[in-house]
Amino acid sequence: MDKRWSLQGMTALVTGAASGIGYAIVEELASFGAIIHICDISETLLSQSLSEWEKKGFQVSGSICDVASRPDREKLMQTVSSLFDGKLNILVNNVGVIRGKPTTEYVAEDFSYHISTNLEPAFHFSQLSHLLLKASGFGSIVFMSSATGVVSVQCGSIYSLTKGALNQLTRNLACEWAKDGIRANAVAPNVVKTPLSQSYLEDVGFKEALFSRTPLGRAGEPNEVASLVVFLCLPAASYITGQTICIDGGFTVNAFSYKPQA
């Protein structure tokens, strides 16, 4: 295989990876030959996922981690450093949460909940992994952003601002750490079929509104997002950095639909 299209022997950390998009990212990374460590807050899901990957012959290990806990994050990175001999090729800041409400209904706890899960861990994990990524000689960070961090949507302003902040962090790190051989990019999906989005997609009004604004007329699949994430980590993508790439069925470029009368 052309080495540009291989991750053979490269190491990766994926956060929140025992289900949903994170799970799909691990499967894709492993299929390209990466050696992966994941974290998740659910011991049950983690054990189940690790067992499934072992049966497939994937090289995946895992740790229980509450990413909202600074000590947990530091402990996780110590584990990763030990496992991978002080080097890391890929960091995927995937974990995220959402509480969809009108802005006037949010309370202080909602704000801290989103910041402490969606934004602070991604920033801190990037800090903690800097020396490991630099030591690898070929480092790549991918942030899981959202289409809502690119365009405005109703009932999710705090979630959206955390994703918009990740897009800016992507640009900052891409420029600041390029000299260290580290690239940084963000992936911004539309709604994707995962446990996190299930309740939204079961809402007929939400689903109709979303699909009418999405040219491809459907939600995304986890493996579709995973394909883009893994591409950005490949040597083939070595000149791509600082970008927020929407994977959204056309949602963010769609203005309005109008059919003139015949």
Curated annotation (Swiss-Prot):
Gene Ontology MF terms: oxidoreductase activity
Annotated InterPro entries: NAD(P)-bd_dom_sf (IPR036291), SDR_fam (IPR002347), TR (IPR045000)
Keywords from the named record: NADP, Oxidoreductase
Pfam families: adh_short_C2
Disulfide bond residue pairs: none
Domain of life: Eukaryota
Entry EC no(s): 1.1.1.-
Active-site residues (renumbered): 159
Binding site for substrate: 146
GO cellular component: peroxisome
Membrane-spanning ranges: none
Ligand binding (NADP(+)): 13-37
Family statement drawn from the similarity comment of this UniProt entry: Belongs to the short-chain dehydrogenases/reductases (SDR) family. SDR65C subfamily.
Protein name: Tropinone reductase homolog At2g29310
Organism of origin: Arabidopsis thaliana (Mouse-ear cress)
